[in-house]
Amino acid sequence: MWNMGLLFLIYYCVSIYSAKGDTKDGQVLPLDVGALAEDAGDAEANGEDTPERNSESSVLDTTLAFEPQASTQSTPIHGAVPTWRPKRDNCTPPAIEQFPQPLMNKWARQHGGLILHILVAVFTFFGLAIVCDEYFVASLDRLCEELKLSPDVAGATFMAAGSSAPELATVVIGVFFAKDDIGISGVIGSAVFNIMFVISVCALCSGTVCQLNWWPLVRDCFFYCVSILVMLIIIFNDVISCFESVVMLLCYVGYCVALHFNTELERWALGLNLPFKLPSKEEQSALVTYKNVPEGSYTQESVGQTQGQKATDDSETRSAKPQSDYQDYSDPNPTWDPNAAWGDESQPNPVANPPPVDDWGMGHSGQENMGYHADQPESVVTGDGPPAAVKSGGQVVSTQATSAGGNDYYKSTDKQREPRRDPLLRPMEGGLPALVSWYVVYPIHFLCKKTMPDCRQEQYRNWYPFTFLMSMVWISFYSYFMVWMITVIGSTLAIPDTVMGLTFVAAGVSVPDALSSIAVIKEGFGDMAVSNAIGSNVFDILVCLGLPWFIQTAIIKPGSHVNVISKGLAYSTLSLFSTVVFLILSTHLNGWKLDKRLGIILMVWYLFFITLASLYELNVFGYMNPPECPSTY
């Protein structure tokens, strides 16, 4: 320990001497003070090529794992700021050393022990999905109701945090524990996973063709592009400051404000002369948000044949209007009964119409809206915003309007038509696969049930603050073990952390979003599934990255900055623009419908993007990611 302290003192003195020698050029380079010991790669990057520095570099390379206490002394060098993590040009500090030492050494892991780490990582994926879906989202649902937030703001803040909690926890662990790029790469990979893989699986799993509305898709993609641009500008110089993290958070505040005025923006957009097929009023209703038909019966000819065959005079009048007349479509229509549109007559309405026939000549009878229940009128929300949140298991929080005279704040939908089945009870149906899956997730359900009250149940509805806190603890627990196991796997297989983040971590943290979108697409909610997948990406980039960076640079170590080690992440972020353009272009060329053909196209593009991004991180196209430094773990 005494020898290491002496080496650091020698290194510090040489650094000051070298920096003073550079003043003859009229420029003083910043010196990183008070963080970790830096090696010869930093000296070369700063132009410090003195003989004394070169003689010390070979000795200092042996102290890469040395982590001294942060110095409180100031330095006379102008512009010096403490860094959170040293950047090295010769090698990347091993992230595995930031975690407890594994029980198995590297030789044991390479000869079969790695399978245990893989199983633990998969188990953490299940844990994150169950905790987020069953408890965390439910507590946020009740929290939004108690705060009486507007539906759009609730959906863009708390409910978005529900499905994106694993991404946020992963970035926090990557910044404060692993101290590497696994959090950033996980967010980038999760963004591609949501916008390509999840939507592709939704299209492949759906047995119907869902006609998509262009406005929610274009709106979400626009803000998604803005968030990508902000992220690209911020990480392009490989450092993140406090000001830049604040900019990211303010951008998300602007996104919430835009969602609050979604009605005005939508009216303005629909008043434009755009070459898109506008949906009917039923399609824009809070309850009828999609059009779906059996996949084999969708043809362009059938569209033309059924345009003039409307079930009511009102729909005939709408079909004859020009596009510019649709700008007032969202005004309340008291003569249209949403219950009648679904074939539900359990609620009386003085002006009830028969179930309308859609553009494909098919009625809506027998189809269930997941955000509305006839026996629970209080669960319906008003507001003209996009879907606030989607929860797997047949539960959706809709944030669109039913009438102008209703409540304009968020309402919980935690009451269900059918009682929930106790997950601790052994399944009687499904055979061996259901029994095996029950045994696998039984420990997760058991621990959650014993430590957190289910605030969806009537007797625990007021316990949502405790459920919220405990679910955050469990999410942090599973996320920590997930990042730990992924780091061990990558270190054992000599795979960079950024590649593991783009692939395995991205898939693991996106499980809640994937389950939500797949659940609603099976019910025919194409717009809702796509909006859930794209909208969560805005939260992932602006909040899941901006908030941990702000805490680190403004609260924990004011004046410091966070370093981005891999240069390939900037190229991966730039490539995210291609995913947005490809999604909109392919959807438009496919007639704004979600079918199996679009699903296959998106799946191929996802595999291509992940392969290209991984090759960047593996230095196939140039020196982007320094190799990992030797480690004794």
From Swiss-Prot:
It is a multi-pass membrane protein. Coiled coil: none annotated. GO terms for molecular function: calcium channel activity; calcium, potassium:sodium antiporter activity; symporter activity. Changing S516G: In RNA edited version. Residues 1-21 form the signal peptide. Residues 22-111, 179-181, 263-427, 490-500, 557-568, 619-633 are extracellular. The keyword Ligase does not apply. Residues 298-422 are annotated as: Disordered. Residues 298-310, 320-333, 395-405 have a biased composition (Polar residues). Residues 133-157, 203-220, 449-468, 522-535, 590-597 are cytoplasmic. Keywords: Antiport, Calcium, Calcium transport, Ion transport, Membrane, Potassium, Potassium transport, Repeat, Signal, Sodium, Sodium transport, Symport, Transmembrane, Transmembrane helix, Transport. The keyword Transmembrane helix applies. It is found in: Membrane. GO terms for cellular component: membrane; plasma membrane. Pfam families: Na_Ca_ex. Alpha- repeats lie at residues 153-193, 506-537. GO terms for biological process: calcium ion transmembrane transport; calcium ion transport; intracellular calcium ion homeostasis; sodium ion transport. Residues 411-422 have a biased composition (Basic and acidic residues). Disulfide bonds: none annotated. It comes from the Eukaryota. The chain crosses the membrane at residues 112-132, 158-178, 182-202, 221-241, 242-262, 428-448, 469-489, 501-521, 536-556, 569-589, 598-618. PANTHER family: SODIUM/POTASSIUM/CALCIUM EXCHANGER, SODIUM_POTASSIUM_CALCIUM EXCHANGER CG1090-RELATED. Belongs to the Ca(2+):cation antiporter (CaCA) (TC 2.A.19) family. SLC24A subfamily. May function in the removal and maintenance of calcium homeostasis. Transports one Ca(2+) and 1 K(+) in exchange for 4 Na(+). This is Probable sodium/potassium/calcium exchanger CG1090. The lineage of its organism: Eukaryota, Metazoa, Ecdysozoa, Arthropoda, Hexapoda.
